[in-house]
């Protein structure tokens, strides 16, 4: 995928360098260079935009024989391009442009201009006529252009330095980054408006058709628009397939590297041309991973494939398949071969790698008979290499072997090189061959092929001159090469070098490569020349290695992209350039050695966190107190510096929140106020203990920040209600029954003593304490109600009946004691503290009910003559104790600067019960006993009377 470079210029158009042109047949054809505007195909390494120009001139000399003189007229083919003041005529052959002329001396009679060209005839004496006039015949010019692509209208949509010069001569181990492996995506690269046009083109005056004159500055241009699907990835490929008669390039063979550029010179795809299949395979760079919606158009310089399209004035089908889109067009080709010329030559091709000129010369096409034939080649700016043994002489056995395209099939020729001696002289810049080789006469025909290599020491643009010195005429032919649009030829034999090295993860951030630190895969690396023009781009392999190859001596710039999640480490640490980091952009100098020291280190960008706490500020002081608790469920939003929301969360049950995986930078934290709460005071104390407010700006610089807090307190309503209810019930019931029956004739004495004692004690104590502290109104209401009822009932009934003649003694003693004690104690304490209204209501109700019932019944009946003694003793004791204690209290905290109001209401006292009716009960009891005794006495007297 790397864009290769030769010695001095890119495989494309590089400003201020020499591109050489071959000049042929008397004149120079001007070759215009197409300047790429946006997207460039085929600007592969160091291609000269070559046009071939050949010059020849024929001079007549004296002849010993005499004959009637004959005028020969040399006519120019294209009057617009010749400076000679000659008569104009038209010819259906390639036009010529005038350049440096060479003198050709020839003695002949009745000379005909080649290929229907009408020449300006000068006077020629033959036989007995002698002339000294010189005549010149103008032949076609041959201009060849090499690969040149003009690109247009590229549009893309983006998907997302200090230079330190140095010169390094050390050698390093070359580890080439592994190429991306992709798939063929011919179906995802779409071409439209495909066309093959002739530039400039020449119109045949006879047929009216435009022809491609391959040796007269014409080139072919392949044009098309295209779009690239967004699904295409780095490493994917697509192809250009050229047909049988059509190839990229010009006189100069297409380079192996054919790259695709955008308007800014960035490489979109790297192409490799295979001359065997006549196919270019393009591999996409990481450009397509960085941009979407890539579309544009291009123009690519192309040429007729000489080995197949061999014949002048013949239409050939020029066909090309771009991706999956095929286009073809028939083009008439003319190379301008002049079959009547004893000496004619052409640049067969220019080698793309070493820029050597591979020349072909046709000797004695007319099959003249000579007694002298000396073939001499003089090089200017070039040299022969005798050791290469590429100076070949072939004898032609079939006239058809002089093919018009100057690319004969040498396998069908007779190689007679060993029969001749090639004499090199002038520092291998001159080669001389005697084609007679001791023969007295010969009409043999030859095809001579040579290779001329650029001479590094020469400052001239270069020229190749041929002469064929015969016994009749001395023919000269010249091929020269000139500059075009500031381009220059490269020195093909200059050595190429490599540049690159390593991208690694600097885990300890020390700026140095350590043994345990590993490379980073997938980092984009871009190579630029000293003018900032992109030459190549690549991606680091799985070991972090990258390399650019095929580079000449010079200064280069290398740019590294920062991989996602990493930060560039410190650059230029220490003195060992081989193990330091050179930063994101660095400069490397190649001087007669590889430079494998351009490294860049990165460390994983640390991630940080921020957050802390949202709490309930019960005392409204704006400070976090140890007794104050967090608030759950508060929404917190995090924004970046652009105001974009990058995270939301809610506080947990402890009021805590946090945001993680944050880079250093500026952020904003926004707290959403909980319903019913009020923002507390801000920035009242240390940053980790205060409230920061509803929106907080924060900057993270290589550290976490857990000081972003906020506090709230409850809004202005507080209500405290305390109710206390105490109820006590006591019931005491005592029943006594005594029955005595005595019948006697004796005396009866009845004594009844009844004692009933009921004691009720009720004690109710209610204490209500309400404490309210508020900034506004506080209302505390405490109600205490204590009710104690005591009921003691003692009933004693004694009945004594005695009938006797004897004494009767009845003693009845009834004692009823009822004691009721009810104690109710209610304590209500309400404390309310609020900014607004505080209402404390304490209600205490204590009810004590004591009921004591004592019933004593004594019945004595005595009927006897004897003594009867009846004793009834009733004792009833009822004790009831009720104790109720109620305490109600509520404490409501509030914030600073509020006032407190206290209200206290006294509890109602419980009524005393159980003591007021004791005397009346005792009176009733004793009255009843006395009545009973009276009845017994009366009843006894009546019985005595009856008896």
Swiss-Prot record:
UniProt keyword annotation of Repeat present: yes
Stored PROSITE patterns: GRAM_POS_ANCHORING
From the UniProt annotation, give the residues forming the signal peptide: 1-50
> What range(s) does the CNA-B domain occupy?
496-606, 607-717
Species source reads: Staphylococcus aureus (strain COL)
Instruction: Show the ranges annotated as biased composition (Polar residues).
Output: 56-71, 84-155
> How is the subunit organization of this protein annotated in UniProt?
Homodimerizes; via N2-Domain. Interacts with host NRXN1; this interaction mediates bacterial attachment to host cells.
Q: What is the lineage of its organism?
A: Bacteria, Bacillati, Bacillota, Bacilli, Bacillales
Q: How does it sit in the membrane?
A: Peptidoglycan-anchor
Which named protein is this? Serine-aspartate repeat-containing protein C
Q: List the disulfide bonds.
A: none
Q: Which UniProt keywords apply?
A: Calcium, Cell wall, Peptidoglycan-anchor, Repeat, Secreted, Signal
Annotated function: Cell surface-associated calcium-binding protein which plays an important role in adhesion and pathogenesis. Mediates interactions with components of the extracellular matrix such as host NRXN1 to promote bacterial adhesion.
């Amino acid at each position: 995928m790397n864009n290769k470079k030769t010695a001095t210029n890119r495989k494309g158009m590089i400003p201020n360098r020499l591109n050489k042109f071959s000049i042929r047949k008397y004149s120079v054809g001007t070759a215009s260079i197409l300047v790429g505007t946006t997207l460039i195909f085929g600007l592969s390494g160091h291609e000269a935009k070559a046009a071939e120009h050949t010059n020849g001139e024929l001079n007549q000399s004296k002849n010993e024989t005499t004959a009637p003189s004959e005028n020969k007229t040399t006519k120019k083919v294209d009057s617009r391009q010749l400076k000679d003041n000659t008569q104009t005529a038209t010819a259906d052959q390639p036009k010529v442009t005038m350049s440096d002329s060479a003198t050709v001396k020839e003695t002949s009679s009745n000379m005909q201009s080649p290929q229907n060209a009408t020449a300006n005839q000068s006077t020629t004496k033959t036989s007995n006529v002698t002339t000294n006039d010189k005549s010149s015949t103008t032949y076609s010019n041959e201009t060849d252009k090499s690969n040149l692509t003009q690109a247009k209208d590229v549009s893309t949509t983006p998907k997302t330095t200090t230079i330190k010069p140095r010169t390094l001569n050390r050698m390093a181990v070359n580890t080439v980054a592994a190429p991306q492996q992709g798939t063929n995506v011919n179906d995802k690269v779409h071409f439209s408006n495909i066309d093959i046009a002739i530039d400039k083109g020449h119109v045949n005056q006879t047929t009216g058709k435009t022809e491609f004159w391959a040796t007269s500055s014409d080139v072919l241009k392949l044009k098309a628009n295209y779009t690239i699907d967004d699904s295409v990835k780095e490493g994917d490929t697509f192809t250009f397939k050229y047909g049988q008669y059509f190839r990229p390039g010009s006189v100069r063979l297409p380079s192996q590297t054919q790259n695709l550029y955008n308007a800014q010179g960035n490489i979109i795809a790297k192409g490799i041309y295979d001359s065997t299949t006549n196919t270019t395979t393009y591999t996409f760079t990481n450009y397509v991973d960085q941009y979407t919606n890539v579309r544009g158009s291009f123009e690519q310089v192309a040429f007729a494939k000489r080995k197949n399209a061999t014949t002048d004035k013949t239409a050939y089908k020029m066909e090309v398949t771009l991706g999956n889109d095929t286009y073809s067009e028939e083009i008439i080709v003319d190379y301008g071969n002049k079959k009547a010329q004893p000496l004619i030559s052409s640049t067969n091709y220019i080698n793309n790698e070493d820029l050597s000129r591979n020349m072909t010369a046709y000797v004695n096409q007319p099959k003249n008979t000579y007694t002298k034939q000396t073939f001499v080649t003089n090089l200017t700016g070039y040299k022969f290499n005798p050791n290469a043994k590429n100076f070949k002489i072939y004898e032609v056995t079939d006239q058809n072997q002089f093919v018009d395209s100057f690319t004969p099939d040498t396998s069908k020729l007779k190689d007679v090189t060993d029969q001749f001696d090639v004499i090199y002289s002038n520092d291998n810049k001159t080669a001389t061959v005697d084609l007679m080789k001791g023969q007295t006469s010969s009409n043999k025909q030859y095809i001579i092929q040579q290779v001329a290599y650029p001479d590094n020491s020469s400052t001239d643009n270069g020229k190749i001159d041929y002469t064929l010195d015969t016994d009749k005429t001395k023919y000269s032919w010249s091929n020269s090469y000139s500059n075009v649009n500031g381009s220059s030829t490269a020195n093909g034999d200059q050595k190429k070098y490599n540049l690159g090295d390593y991208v690694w993860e600097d885990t300890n951030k020390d700026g140095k490569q350590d043994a345990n630190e590993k490379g980073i895969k997938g980092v984009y690396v871009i190579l630029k020349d000293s003018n900032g023009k992109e030459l190549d781009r690549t991606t680091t392999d799985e070991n972090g290695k990258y390399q650019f190859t095929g580079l000449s001596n010079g200064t280069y710039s290398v740019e590294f992209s920062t991989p996602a999640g990493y930060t560039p480490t410190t650059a230029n640490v220490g003195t060992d350039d081989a193990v330091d980091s050179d930063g994101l952009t660095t400069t490397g100098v190649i001087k007669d050695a590889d430079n494998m020291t351009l490294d860049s280190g990165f460390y994983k960008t640390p991630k940080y966190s921020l957050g802390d706490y949202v709490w309930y500020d019960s005392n409204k002081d704006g400070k976090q107190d140890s007794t104050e608790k967090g608030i759950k469920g508060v929404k917190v939003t995090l924004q970046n510096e652009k105001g974009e929301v990058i995270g939301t969360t809610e506080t947990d049950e402890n009021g805590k929140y946090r945001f993680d995986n944050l880079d250093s930078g500026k952020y904003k934290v926004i707290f959403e106020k909980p319903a019913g709460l009020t923002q507390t005071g801000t920035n009242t104390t240390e940053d980790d203990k205060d409230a920061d407010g509803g929106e907080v700006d924060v900057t993270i610089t290589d550290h976490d920040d857990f000081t972003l807090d906020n506090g709230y307190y409850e809004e202005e309503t507080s209500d405290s209600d305390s109710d206390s209810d105490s109820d006590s019930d006591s019931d005491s019931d005592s029943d006594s029954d005594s029955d005595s029956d005595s019948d006697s004739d004796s005396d009866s004495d009845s004594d009844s003593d009844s004692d009933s004692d009921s004691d009720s004690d009720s004690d109710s104590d209610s204490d209500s304490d309400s404490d309210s502290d508020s900034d506004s109104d506080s209302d505390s209401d405490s109600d205490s109600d204590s009710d104690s009822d005591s009921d003691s009932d003692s009933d004693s009934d004694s009945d004594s009946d005695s009938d006797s003649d004897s004494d009767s003694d009845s003693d009845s003693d009834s004692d009823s004691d009822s004691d009721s004690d009810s104690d109710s104690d209610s304590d209500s304490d309400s404390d309310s503290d609020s900014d607004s209204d505080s209402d404390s209501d304490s209600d205490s109700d204590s009810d004590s009910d004591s009921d004591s019932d004592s019933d004593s019944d004594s019945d004595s009946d005595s009927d006897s003559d004897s003594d009867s003694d009846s004793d009834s003793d009733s004792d009833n004791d009822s004790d009831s104790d009720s104790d109720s204690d109620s305490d109600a209290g509520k404490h409501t905290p509030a914030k600073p600067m509020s006032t407190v109001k206290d209200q206290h209401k006294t509890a109602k006292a419980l009524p005393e019960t159980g003591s007021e009716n004791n005397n009346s009960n005792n009176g009733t009891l004793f009255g009843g006993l006395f009545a009973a005794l009276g009845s017994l006495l009366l009843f006894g007297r009546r019985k005595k009377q009856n008896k």
